[in-house]
Regions:
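N-proximal low-complexity "stem/linker" segments adjacent to membrane-targeting elements
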Residues: 1-38
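Short beta-strand/loop segment that forms part of the nucleotide-sugar
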Residues: 45-55, 77-80
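Hydrophobic helical membrane-anchoring modules
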Residues: 1-14, 196, 200-347
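A conserved acidic beta->alpha catalytic loop
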Residues: 53-62, 110
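Acceptor/aglycone-binding surface of glycosyltransferases and processive sugar-polymer synthases
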Residues: 75, 81-97, 102-105, 114-195, ...
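Short helix-capping segments at alpha-helix termini
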Residues: 40-45, 69-75, 126-128
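Acidic helix N-cap motif at the loop->helix transition within catalytic regions
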Residues: 27-31, 58-67
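Donor nucleotide-sugar binding loop of glycosyltransferases
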Residues: 25-28, 56, 87, 113
């Protein structure tokens, strides 16, 4: 038995599934896939590598198929569909196709670390009390390397802002590099395949009582920078990120209604009480109190409305939570997905 197929606890690493989506990655797909395969061969006795082509319009898929043919390894599976539907759709498609008890989702180019798959696997396999693990560059021992400063600021600011609104217990809410137990993630019903996907998964798993942990990691874009595949920041990018953050916060408000609508209700009612005291003071001192009392009444009415929203949305969430665990295959929505493995490609 190879020592590198053992975890730090000395246990033999079991079968693992790695899911990596890609879209128009013609410049790096072969290098990225090769690096991941080498890492899996070093760290695991048995594995499967699922690459999901999210409707690429360049020759990424053809290059990848040629690479797999040369490597001659049947452990690699390629899923493909058209048209492009977003990375999150690709992730759920790959997750639903995975067969190992532990499923790891990450970029194929190992930008989260050469040993990220082993570390995520061990953080889950060696700790039975954990249900999923998130890799975070925002922890004390994590960081960024060759990542544009603007993206670092957006990641740190966005995740910190979400953390203020969402009592998740983690520092990284939006990253895709995670490890899940198959019994936890495959049945999860997903309704959003935009940027809210990662947040929806986190929110639903936490609501259902599943336990999460984090490991520190350094996110490096050295390979992407060397290949010139990093897109420069633009005003459009900034606006898109602001829309993403806004939609994340709206999603959290709906997902945790008592926390937000309830808080607004309390604040509004306290303000109404303040207007009542102001009106009484005006009345005692000979001033006009009617305007203050009228405003207090309106605020009290709004407070009751917000409280009603929180109760209704909480009940709706509790009712819908019962159906969150029957969602395997929901990502595909019966869309045609083509699958390739070595024996099919080499014909």
């Amino acid at each position: 038995m190879r020592k590198d197929s053992l975890s730090k606890s000395g246990k033999r690493r079991g079968f693992v599934s790695v899911v990596s989506p890609f879209y128009n990655e013609t410049d790096i797909i072969v290098t990225a896939a090769t690096r991941m395969i080498e890492s899996l061969n070093r760290g695991f006795a048995d594995w499967e590598f699922i690459l999901v082509d999210d409707g690429s319009t360049d020759d990424s898929l053809d290059k990848l198929k040629g690479c797999i043919s040369e490597l001659g390894n049947p452990k690699i599976k390629v899923l493909s569909y058209q048209p492009n539907m977003g990375r999150c759709r690709a992730l759920k498609t790959g997750i639903d196709a995975a067969s190992a008890d532990i499923i790891i989702t990450t970029e194929a180019d190992l930008s989260w670390g050469e040993d990220i798959v082993e570390r995520l696997h061990d953080a889950l396999a060696d700790y039975p009390d954990r249900d999923f693990v998130i890799a975070s560059p925002h922890l004390a021992e994590g960081g960024f390397n060759e990542v544009p400063f603007s993206r670092v600021c957006l990641s740190q600011g966005g995740n910190r802002l979400i953390g203020w609104f969402f009592d998740s217990g983690v520092s990284m809410h939006t990253g895709m590099t995670r490890a899940y137990r198959r019994s936890v993630i495959q049945p999860l019903k997903i309704t959003s395949y935009d940027k809210e996907f990662h947040l929806e998964v986190l929110l639903k798993l936490r609501t259902l009582g599943y336990r999460v942990a984090e490991i520190p990691t350094v996110l490096s874009w050295e390979v992407r920078r060397s290949k010139g595949t990093i897109q420069p920041k633009s005003n459009l990018f900034t606006r898109r990120m602001m829309r993403t953050i806004s939609s994340h916060l709206l999603f959290l408000a709906i997902g945790q209604p008592m926390r937000y609508f309830g808080a607004v209700s309390v604040i509004t009612m306290l303000t109404a009480i303040g207007f009542v005291f102001a009106g009484l003071w005006n009345f005692v001192t000979g001033g006009v109190a009617a305007n203050f009392i009228l405003m207090a009444g309106l605020l009290a009415l709004f407070s009751v409305v917000f409280l009603g929203f929180s109760v209704v949305f909480t009940q709706l969430r509790e009712l819908s939570a019962a159906s969150w665990s029957d969602g395997k295959g929901s990502a595909a929505d019966h869309m045609p997905v083509r699958a390739w493995q070595l024996e099919k490609i080499s014909k």
